[in-house]
Amino acid sequence: MENQPNSNPLRKLYLLLLAIGPGIFAIGYTIGTGSVTSMIVAGSEHGMQLLWGLFLSCLFSWVLMEAYGRYALVTGESALFGFKKHLKFGSAISILIIIGVSFGQWNSLIGILGISANAIFETIVLFIPALEGYEYWGVLITALIIISIMYTMLWHGSYTVFERILVIFVSFMGLSFFLSFFIAIPDASAILNGMIPSIPEVENGEKGEGQLLVAAIVGTTMAAATFLSRPLFIQGKGWTIENMKDQSKDARWAAILIFIISGSIMAVAMGAFYHDGVKVERVLDMVDALEPIAGRFAIAIFFIGTLSAGLSSVFPILMICPLLIADYQDGKLDMKSKQFKTLTGIACLISLIVPVMGANPIKAQLVTQVLNVFVLPLVIFGILVLINRKELMGKYKAGPVLNIGIVLSLIFACFISYNGVLAILEKL
Protein backbone atom coordinates (compact mmCIF):
# COMPACT_ATOMS: atom_id res chain seq x y z
CA MET A 1 0.00 0.00 0.00
CA GLU A 2 2.92 2.37 0.64
CA ASN A 3 3.97 2.31 -2.99
CA GLN A 4 0.51 2.99 -4.31
CA PRO A 5 0.78 6.80 -4.47
CA ASN A 6 4.01 6.53 -6.46
CA SER A 7 2.32 4.33 -9.09
CA ASN A 8 -0.16 7.09 -9.88
CA PRO A 9 0.80 8.35 -13.40
CA LEU A 10 -0.49 11.88 -12.71
CA ARG A 11 1.66 12.10 -9.56
CA LYS A 12 4.68 10.77 -11.49
CA LEU A 13 4.19 13.44 -14.15
CA TYR A 14 3.76 16.10 -11.45
CA LEU A 15 7.04 15.07 -9.76
CA LEU A 16 8.86 14.96 -13.12
CA LEU A 17 7.69 18.46 -14.00
CA LEU A 18 8.47 19.76 -10.51
CA ALA A 19 12.02 18.43 -10.94
CA ILE A 20 12.39 20.38 -14.21
CA GLY A 21 12.51 23.71 -12.36
CA PRO A 22 12.75 26.93 -14.43
CA GLY A 23 11.97 24.89 -17.56
CA ILE A 24 8.35 24.71 -16.41
CA PHE A 25 8.10 28.45 -17.11
CA ALA A 26 9.50 27.77 -20.60
CA ILE A 27 6.68 25.28 -21.17
CA GLY A 28 4.20 27.83 -19.78
CA TYR A 29 5.46 30.59 -22.10
CA THR A 30 5.64 28.28 -25.10
CA ILE A 31 2.48 26.16 -24.98
CA GLY A 32 -0.48 28.46 -24.60
CA THR A 33 -3.68 28.73 -26.59
CA GLY A 34 -1.64 30.46 -29.31
CA SER A 35 0.47 27.35 -29.69
CA VAL A 36 -2.63 25.15 -29.55
CA THR A 37 -4.28 27.30 -32.24
CA SER A 38 -1.21 27.30 -34.50
CA MET A 39 -0.76 23.53 -34.20
CA ILE A 40 -4.44 22.82 -34.82
CA VAL A 41 -4.60 25.10 -37.86
CA ALA A 42 -1.40 23.48 -39.19
CA GLY A 43 -2.64 19.93 -38.57
CA SER A 44 -6.19 20.50 -39.81
CA GLU A 45 -5.19 22.27 -43.04
CA HIS A 46 -1.82 20.69 -43.87
CA GLY A 47 -1.59 17.45 -41.91
CA MET A 48 1.88 16.85 -40.45
CA GLN A 49 3.61 18.83 -43.23
CA LEU A 50 4.89 21.48 -40.79
CA LEU A 51 6.24 19.08 -38.16
CA TRP A 52 9.76 19.97 -39.32
CA GLY A 53 9.20 23.58 -38.27
CA LEU A 54 8.12 22.48 -34.80
CA PHE A 55 11.10 20.10 -34.48
CA LEU A 56 13.67 22.72 -35.48
CA SER A 57 12.04 25.29 -33.20
CA CYS A 58 12.24 22.91 -30.23
CA LEU A 59 15.83 21.93 -31.08
CA PHE A 60 16.96 25.56 -31.26
CA SER A 61 14.93 26.41 -28.14
CA TRP A 62 16.96 23.78 -26.27
CA VAL A 63 20.18 25.36 -27.53
CA LEU A 64 19.11 28.87 -26.49
CA MET A 65 17.79 27.79 -23.08
CA GLU A 66 21.15 26.08 -22.48
CA ALA A 67 23.06 29.21 -23.54
CA TYR A 68 21.04 31.65 -21.42
CA GLY A 69 21.04 29.26 -18.45
CA ARG A 70 24.80 28.78 -18.64
CA TYR A 71 25.39 32.53 -18.87
CA ALA A 72 23.20 33.13 -15.82
CA LEU A 73 24.92 30.50 -13.66
CA VAL A 74 28.47 31.58 -14.57
CA THR A 75 28.09 35.38 -14.40
CA GLY A 76 25.17 35.71 -11.98
CA GLU A 77 23.73 38.29 -14.39
CA SER A 78 20.36 38.39 -16.11
CA ALA A 79 19.95 38.75 -19.87
CA LEU A 80 19.10 42.41 -20.52
CA PHE A 81 21.31 43.62 -17.67
CA GLY A 82 24.16 41.74 -19.37
CA PHE A 83 23.30 43.26 -22.76
CA LYS A 84 23.25 46.77 -21.26
CA LYS A 85 26.52 46.22 -19.41
CA HIS A 86 28.63 44.40 -21.99
CA LEU A 87 27.32 45.14 -25.51
CA LYS A 88 27.91 48.22 -27.64
CA PHE A 89 24.52 49.94 -28.03
CA GLY A 90 23.35 47.42 -25.41
CA SER A 91 20.91 49.87 -23.81
CA ALA A 92 19.19 50.61 -27.13
CA ILE A 93 19.03 46.90 -28.00
CA SER A 94 17.58 46.08 -24.56
CA ILE A 95 14.91 48.79 -24.75
CA LEU A 96 13.91 47.63 -28.24
CA ILE A 97 13.65 44.06 -26.96
CA ILE A 98 11.55 45.14 -23.94
CA ILE A 99 9.10 47.00 -26.20
CA GLY A 100 8.94 44.23 -28.82
CA VAL A 101 8.59 41.31 -26.40
CA SER A 102 6.12 43.08 -24.08
CA PHE A 103 3.94 44.14 -27.01
CA GLY A 104 4.03 40.66 -28.57
CA GLN A 105 3.34 38.87 -25.29
CA TRP A 106 0.55 41.25 -24.28
CA ASN A 107 -1.05 40.68 -27.67
CA SER A 108 -0.75 36.95 -27.05
CA LEU A 109 -2.38 37.42 -23.65
CA ILE A 110 -5.33 39.18 -25.29
CA GLY A 111 -5.95 36.15 -27.51
CA ILE A 112 -5.24 33.64 -24.73
CA LEU A 113 -7.82 35.09 -22.37
CA GLY A 114 -10.33 35.38 -25.21
CA ILE A 115 -9.88 31.73 -26.22
CA SER A 116 -9.89 30.43 -22.63
CA ALA A 117 -13.08 32.35 -21.77
CA ASN A 118 -14.71 31.18 -25.03
CA ALA A 119 -13.72 27.57 -24.35
CA ILE A 120 -15.25 27.65 -20.86
CA PHE A 121 -18.46 29.39 -21.96
CA GLU A 122 -19.02 27.22 -25.06
CA THR A 123 -18.51 24.08 -22.99
CA ILE A 124 -21.01 25.32 -20.38
CA VAL A 125 -23.52 25.96 -23.22
CA LEU A 126 -23.22 22.27 -24.22
CA PHE A 127 -24.69 21.34 -20.85
CA ILE A 128 -26.88 24.42 -20.30
CA PRO A 129 -28.36 25.25 -23.76
CA ALA A 130 -30.49 28.06 -22.25
CA LEU A 131 -27.33 30.22 -22.10
CA GLU A 132 -27.05 30.21 -25.89
CA GLY A 133 -27.42 33.74 -27.22
CA TYR A 134 -25.74 35.31 -24.20
CA GLU A 135 -22.25 34.66 -25.54
CA TYR A 136 -20.92 38.23 -25.26
CA TRP A 137 -21.73 38.71 -21.58
CA GLY A 138 -20.96 35.10 -20.73
CA VAL A 139 -17.48 35.28 -22.25
CA LEU A 140 -16.79 38.71 -20.72
CA ILE A 141 -17.82 37.66 -17.20
CA THR A 142 -15.79 34.44 -17.53
CA ALA A 143 -12.74 36.43 -18.65
CA LEU A 144 -13.12 38.83 -15.71
CA ILE A 145 -13.29 35.94 -13.24
CA ILE A 146 -10.19 34.25 -14.74
CA ILE A 147 -8.02 37.37 -14.81
CA SER A 148 -9.14 38.46 -11.31
CA ILE A 149 -8.13 35.09 -9.84
CA MET A 150 -4.78 35.22 -11.64
CA TYR A 151 -4.02 38.76 -10.48
CA THR A 152 -4.92 37.89 -6.88
CA MET A 153 -2.47 34.97 -7.00
CA LEU A 154 0.24 37.21 -8.46
CA TRP A 155 -0.37 39.80 -5.72
CA HIS A 156 0.29 37.28 -2.95
CA GLY A 157 2.53 34.70 -4.65
CA SER A 158 6.22 33.83 -4.91
CA TYR A 159 8.44 31.90 -7.33
CA THR A 160 7.74 28.58 -5.59
CA VAL A 161 3.97 29.16 -5.62
CA PHE A 162 3.96 30.08 -9.33
CA GLU A 163 6.13 27.08 -10.18
CA ARG A 164 3.80 24.64 -8.43
CA ILE A 165 0.67 26.16 -10.01
CA LEU A 166 2.28 25.93 -13.45
CA VAL A 167 3.22 22.29 -12.80
CA ILE A 168 -0.44 21.47 -12.12
CA PHE A 169 -1.64 23.21 -15.31
CA VAL A 170 1.10 21.66 -17.46
CA SER A 171 0.39 18.19 -15.99
CA PHE A 172 -3.28 18.41 -16.99
CA MET A 173 -2.36 19.88 -20.38
CA GLY A 174 0.23 17.21 -21.17
CA LEU A 175 -2.00 14.29 -20.18
CA SER A 176 -5.04 15.73 -21.99
CA PHE A 177 -3.29 16.25 -25.32
CA PHE A 178 -1.40 12.96 -25.03
CA LEU A 179 -4.68 11.06 -24.47
CA SER A 180 -6.26 12.96 -27.37
CA PHE A 181 -3.39 11.75 -29.57
CA PHE A 182 -4.50 8.14 -29.04
CA ILE A 183 -8.11 9.03 -29.84
CA ALA A 184 -7.14 10.21 -33.36
CA ILE A 185 -3.78 8.60 -34.21
CA PRO A 186 -2.34 9.84 -37.55
CA ASP A 187 -0.57 7.68 -40.12
CA ALA A 188 3.11 7.03 -39.22
CA SER A 189 4.28 7.83 -42.77
CA ALA A 190 2.64 11.28 -42.52
CA ILE A 191 4.65 11.98 -39.36
CA LEU A 192 7.91 10.94 -41.06
CA ASN A 193 7.13 12.99 -44.19
CA GLY A 194 6.44 15.96 -41.94
CA MET A 195 10.11 16.03 -40.96
CA ILE A 196 11.04 17.00 -44.55
CA PRO A 197 11.13 20.84 -44.78
CA SER A 198 8.47 22.33 -47.07
CA ILE A 199 6.09 25.29 -47.06
CA PRO A 200 2.51 24.26 -47.90
CA GLU A 201 0.59 25.75 -50.79
CA VAL A 202 -2.87 27.09 -50.01
CA GLU A 203 -5.51 25.79 -52.41
CA ASN A 204 -7.80 28.82 -52.24
CA GLY A 205 -5.05 31.01 -53.63
CA GLU A 206 -4.48 33.21 -50.57
CA LYS A 207 -0.93 34.51 -50.69
CA GLY A 208 1.46 34.10 -47.82
CA GLU A 209 -0.77 31.76 -45.77
CA GLY A 210 1.83 28.97 -45.68
CA GLN A 211 4.69 31.28 -44.67
CA LEU A 212 2.48 32.99 -42.09
CA LEU A 213 1.63 29.65 -40.47
CA VAL A 214 5.30 28.58 -40.33
CA ALA A 215 6.12 31.94 -38.73
CA ALA A 216 3.27 31.45 -36.23
CA ILE A 217 4.57 28.00 -35.24
CA VAL A 218 8.10 29.33 -34.77
CA GLY A 219 6.81 32.47 -33.04
CA THR A 220 4.98 30.46 -30.40
CA THR A 221 7.70 27.81 -29.95
CA MET A 222 10.86 29.95 -30.10
CA ALA A 223 9.44 32.77 -28.00
CA ALA A 224 12.06 35.37 -27.09
CA ALA A 225 10.42 35.75 -23.67
CA THR A 226 11.31 32.13 -22.86
CA PHE A 227 15.04 32.76 -23.20
CA LEU A 228 15.16 36.27 -21.72
CA SER A 229 13.28 35.22 -18.60
CA ARG A 230 15.36 32.09 -17.98
CA PRO A 231 18.20 33.78 -16.01
CA LEU A 232 15.73 35.41 -13.60
CA PHE A 233 13.79 32.19 -13.06
CA ILE A 234 17.09 30.36 -12.44
CA GLN A 235 17.85 33.10 -9.92
CA GLY A 236 14.41 32.56 -8.34
CA LYS A 237 15.07 28.82 -8.12
CA GLY A 238 18.25 29.54 -6.16
CA TRP A 239 20.55 27.66 -8.52
CA THR A 240 24.30 28.41 -8.60
CA ILE A 241 27.20 27.30 -10.79
CA GLU A 242 27.08 23.99 -8.89
CA ASN A 243 23.76 23.32 -10.64
CA MET A 244 25.19 23.42 -14.17
CA LYS A 245 24.14 19.80 -14.87
CA ASP A 246 20.68 20.46 -13.44
CA GLN A 247 20.34 23.49 -15.71
CA SER A 248 21.32 21.48 -18.80
CA LYS A 249 18.91 18.65 -17.94
CA ASP A 250 16.18 21.21 -17.25
CA ALA A 251 16.63 22.83 -20.69
CA ARG A 252 16.70 19.46 -22.47
CA TRP A 253 13.54 18.11 -20.81
CA ALA A 254 11.64 21.35 -21.36
CA ALA A 255 12.39 21.22 -25.12
CA ILE A 256 11.45 17.51 -25.34
CA LEU A 257 8.12 18.03 -23.56
CA ILE A 258 7.30 21.06 -25.72
CA PHE A 259 7.85 18.95 -28.87
CA ILE A 260 5.83 15.97 -27.58
CA ILE A 261 2.86 18.06 -26.41
CA SER A 262 2.78 20.39 -29.46
CA GLY A 263 3.32 17.47 -31.86
CA SER A 264 0.43 15.59 -30.24
CA ILE A 265 -1.88 18.57 -30.82
CA MET A 266 -0.88 18.76 -34.50
CA ALA A 267 -1.40 15.00 -34.87
CA VAL A 268 -4.84 15.11 -33.23
CA ALA A 269 -5.87 17.94 -35.57
CA MET A 270 -4.71 15.95 -38.58
CA GLY A 271 -6.57 12.82 -37.47
CA ALA A 272 -9.77 14.71 -36.64
CA PHE A 273 -9.91 17.48 -39.27
CA TYR A 274 -7.50 17.06 -42.19
CA HIS A 275 -9.13 14.26 -44.18
CA ASP A 276 -12.60 15.79 -43.84
CA GLY A 277 -11.42 19.25 -44.91
CA VAL A 278 -12.86 20.87 -41.76
CA LYS A 279 -11.66 24.45 -41.10
CA VAL A 280 -11.19 25.86 -37.61
CA GLU A 281 -13.48 28.89 -37.30
CA ARG A 282 -14.23 29.01 -33.57
CA VAL A 283 -12.84 27.58 -30.35
CA LEU A 284 -15.21 24.63 -30.08
CA ASP A 285 -14.40 23.49 -33.65
CA MET A 286 -11.20 22.19 -32.07
CA VAL A 287 -13.12 19.63 -30.04
CA ASP A 288 -16.30 19.08 -32.09
CA ALA A 289 -14.59 16.76 -34.58
CA LEU A 290 -13.50 14.41 -31.78
CA GLU A 291 -17.06 13.85 -30.50
CA PRO A 292 -18.11 11.24 -33.14
CA ILE A 293 -14.97 9.23 -32.29
CA ALA A 294 -15.07 9.30 -28.50
CA GLY A 295 -18.19 11.27 -27.55
CA ARG A 296 -18.38 13.93 -24.85
CA PHE A 297 -15.34 12.33 -23.21
CA ALA A 298 -13.18 13.63 -26.07
CA ILE A 299 -14.58 17.13 -25.66
CA ALA A 300 -13.84 17.04 -21.93
CA ILE A 301 -10.25 15.83 -22.48
CA PHE A 302 -9.40 18.36 -25.17
CA PHE A 303 -11.17 21.17 -23.33
CA ILE A 304 -9.10 20.51 -20.20
CA GLY A 305 -5.93 20.53 -22.30
CA THR A 306 -6.81 23.77 -24.09
CA LEU A 307 -7.85 25.52 -20.89
CA SER A 308 -4.72 24.33 -19.05
CA ALA A 309 -2.58 25.56 -21.95
CA GLY A 310 -4.18 28.98 -21.71
CA LEU A 311 -3.99 29.28 -17.95
CA SER A 312 -0.39 28.01 -17.86
CA SER A 313 0.56 30.91 -20.14
CA VAL A 314 -1.32 33.66 -18.30
CA PHE A 315 1.00 33.66 -15.27
CA PRO A 316 4.30 34.00 -17.16
CA ILE A 317 2.92 36.54 -19.65
CA LEU A 318 1.47 38.78 -16.94
CA MET A 319 4.96 38.78 -15.41
CA ILE A 320 6.95 39.44 -18.59
CA CYS A 321 6.93 43.27 -18.72
CA PRO A 322 7.89 43.88 -15.06
CA LEU A 323 10.36 41.02 -15.36
CA LEU A 324 12.13 42.55 -18.39
CA ILE A 325 12.15 46.06 -16.90
CA ALA A 326 13.59 44.75 -13.62
CA ASP A 327 16.10 42.74 -15.66
CA TYR A 328 17.23 45.91 -17.46
CA GLN A 329 17.35 48.03 -14.29
CA ASP A 330 19.41 45.85 -11.98
CA GLY A 331 19.00 42.21 -12.97
CA LYS A 332 16.78 41.41 -9.97
CA LEU A 333 13.07 40.59 -9.88
CA ASP A 334 11.07 41.63 -6.82
CA MET A 335 7.59 40.10 -7.06
CA LYS A 336 6.42 42.11 -4.06
CA SER A 337 7.37 45.53 -5.48
CA LYS A 338 4.87 48.25 -6.40
CA GLN A 339 6.28 48.30 -9.96
CA PHE A 340 5.61 44.56 -10.38
CA LYS A 341 2.02 44.82 -9.11
CA THR A 342 1.24 47.93 -11.17
CA LEU A 343 2.57 46.53 -14.46
CA THR A 344 0.85 43.16 -13.99
CA GLY A 345 -2.38 45.07 -13.26
CA ILE A 346 -2.02 46.99 -16.55
CA ALA A 347 -1.46 43.68 -18.37
CA CYS A 348 -4.67 42.32 -16.82
CA LEU A 349 -6.67 45.27 -18.19
CA ILE A 350 -5.09 44.90 -21.65
CA SER A 351 -5.97 41.19 -21.69
CA LEU A 352 -9.69 42.02 -21.64
CA ILE A 353 -9.63 43.66 -25.09
CA VAL A 354 -10.84 40.59 -27.06
CA PRO A 355 -13.68 39.73 -24.63
CA VAL A 356 -14.81 43.39 -24.45
CA MET A 357 -14.61 43.93 -28.23
CA GLY A 358 -16.18 40.54 -28.96
CA ALA A 359 -13.43 39.81 -31.53
CA ASN A 360 -12.52 36.44 -33.04
CA PRO A 361 -9.78 35.12 -30.72
CA ILE A 362 -8.51 32.52 -33.23
CA LYS A 363 -7.55 35.14 -35.85
CA ALA A 364 -6.11 37.47 -33.22
CA GLN A 365 -3.96 34.66 -31.84
CA LEU A 366 -2.32 33.70 -35.15
CA VAL A 367 -1.28 37.27 -35.97
CA THR A 368 0.11 37.95 -32.49
CA GLN A 369 2.28 34.82 -32.56
CA VAL A 370 4.01 36.18 -35.68
CA LEU A 371 4.89 39.40 -33.80
CA ASN A 372 6.88 37.32 -31.33
CA VAL A 373 9.34 36.29 -34.06
CA PHE A 374 10.68 39.71 -35.00
CA VAL A 375 12.77 40.44 -31.88
CA LEU A 376 14.12 36.89 -31.77
CA PRO A 377 17.21 37.54 -33.97
CA LEU A 378 18.31 40.32 -31.58
CA VAL A 379 17.88 38.03 -28.57
CA ILE A 380 19.95 35.28 -30.22
CA PHE A 381 22.67 37.65 -31.45
CA GLY A 382 23.10 39.12 -27.95
CA ILE A 383 23.72 35.79 -26.23
CA LEU A 384 26.00 34.64 -29.08
CA VAL A 385 28.32 37.58 -28.34
CA LEU A 386 28.20 37.31 -24.53
CA ILE A 387 28.65 33.56 -24.20
CA ASN A 388 31.82 33.71 -26.32
CA ARG A 389 33.58 36.29 -24.13
CA LYS A 390 36.39 34.57 -22.27
CA GLU A 391 36.57 37.29 -19.60
CA LEU A 392 32.91 36.64 -18.72
CA MET A 393 32.55 32.89 -19.15
CA GLY A 394 36.03 31.53 -18.39
CA LYS A 395 36.14 27.76 -18.94
CA TYR A 396 32.37 27.74 -19.58
CA LYS A 397 32.76 29.78 -22.77
CA ALA A 398 30.71 28.30 -25.64
CA GLY A 399 32.38 25.45 -27.49
CA PRO A 400 32.03 24.53 -31.19
CA VAL A 401 28.80 22.51 -30.77
CA LEU A 402 26.95 25.21 -28.81
CA ASN A 403 28.21 27.93 -31.16
CA ILE A 404 27.04 26.00 -34.23
CA GLY A 405 23.64 25.56 -32.57
CA ILE A 406 23.31 29.27 -31.76
CA VAL A 407 24.44 30.37 -35.25
CA LEU A 408 21.98 27.96 -36.89
CA SER A 409 19.27 29.29 -34.54
CA LEU A 410 20.08 32.83 -35.67
CA ILE A 411 19.96 31.88 -39.37
CA PHE A 412 16.68 30.02 -38.84
CA ALA A 413 15.14 32.95 -36.91
CA CYS A 414 16.18 35.45 -39.61
CA PHE A 415 14.78 33.19 -42.35
CA ILE A 416 11.45 32.80 -40.55
CA SER A 417 11.28 36.54 -39.77
CA TYR A 418 11.92 37.35 -43.43
CA ASN A 419 9.18 34.96 -44.57
CA GLY A 420 6.83 36.33 -41.90
CA VAL A 421 7.36 39.89 -43.16
CA LEU A 422 6.75 38.81 -46.77
CA ALA A 423 3.58 36.96 -45.78
CA ILE A 424 2.18 39.96 -43.89
CA LEU A 425 3.06 42.36 -46.75
CA GLU A 426 1.33 40.06 -49.27
CA LYS A 427 -1.83 40.03 -47.14
CA LEU A 428 -2.00 43.83 -46.82
Language-model features: locations:
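Transmembrane-helix boundary/entry motifs in multi-pass membrane transporters
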Residues: 9-15, 47, 74-103, 126, ...
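Membrane-interface loop-to-helix entry segments
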Residues: 145, 153-184, 371-372, 376, ...
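Transmembrane alpha-helical segments of multi-pass small-molecule transport proteins
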Residues: 125-155, 171-178, 334-353, 376-385
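Hydrophobic transmembrane alpha-helices that form the core helical bundles
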Residues: 92-131, 310-329, 360-367, 414
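Hydrophobic alpha-helical segments and their helix-loop junctions in multi-pass secondary transporters
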Residues: 171-202, 214-215, 220-231, 382-391, ...
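Extracellular/periplasmic helix-exit of transmembrane alpha-helices
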Residues: 62-74, 234-235, 256-285
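Juxtamembrane transmembrane-helix boundary signature
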Residues: 26, 53-86, 97-110, 269
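Flexible loop linkers connecting adjacent transmembrane helices
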Residues: 2-5, 39-41, 66-90, 118-129, ...
